[in-house]
Amino acid sequence: MLKLDHISKSFDGVSVLNDISLEVQDGEIVSILGPSGCGKTTLLNLILGITDTDEGTIYYQEEDITKLSMEKRDFNIVFQDYALFPNLNVYQNIVYGIRNKPGLSTAEEVDALIDLLELRAHLDKKIEQLSGGQKQRVALARTMVMKPKILLLDEPLSALDGVIKESIKDKIKTISRQFHLTTIIVTHDPEEALTLSDRVLIIEHGKISQYDTPAQIVHSPQNDFVRKFILNQLVIKRDNILTLFGAAPLTAGKAV
């Protein structure tokens, strides 16, 4: 389990996160959702250990993460820009992190991931030859060969559209379930968060507005910010989302 206990963070005297407390269960998919500048990327960086908290403690399996080695944290991230190596081909990118590191993925496990993420036909290609969806799948494969227990994804769908976006969503769900990963996703898109996650953390101005299941957020938004941000931004897909979670479709100006 990952636990955040009264986390606060400021930069240059400006509060970015204020008293954030939550728990993420093993194997759970959680999205951190909010508008630009709300603190969601800072929260991801704190979990990853890139940035230190000003106040509060982050625990992984009941241990303070600042006291754990990077190996014991078992965290890995797929960055928004993929961070792939342009001078290497797809296969070389995938296995780059496990070179000379016994105990990580075997050749058979790497092959299984390549097939799961449908990359077999692209192994000899350079990164510049790939589409956005293919790059995202390579980045996922490169991360998964490291056998993380917690997978962090920074805006994994922001550069994708339509069928490609839905395909990557399916891959994220499949990987998370098959490998029993705790998966934490940063996104600004309510539709992505609601359809991809077991629970959604909604942040406004560095504070928790609601932390709940997608169905509960749709049925019972806890405040006006959640109601407006979630429902108004869904626009065309709004009625489909509400139907998916068993709520009556909204009309303009009405809330659940």
Regions found by a protein language model. Give the residues of each.
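Conserved ABC ATPase "signature" region
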Residues: S105-H122, K173-T174
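Conserved ABC ATPase "signature" C-loop
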Residues: H205-G206
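Conserved ABC ATPase signature
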Residues: K126-L130, Q134
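ABC ATPase "signature
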Residues: Y211-D212, S220
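A short, proline-enriched helix->beta-strand linker immediately N-terminal to the Walker B motif
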Residues: V145-K149
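The feature captures the beta-strand-to-loop junction immediately N-terminal to the Walker
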Residues: L33-P35
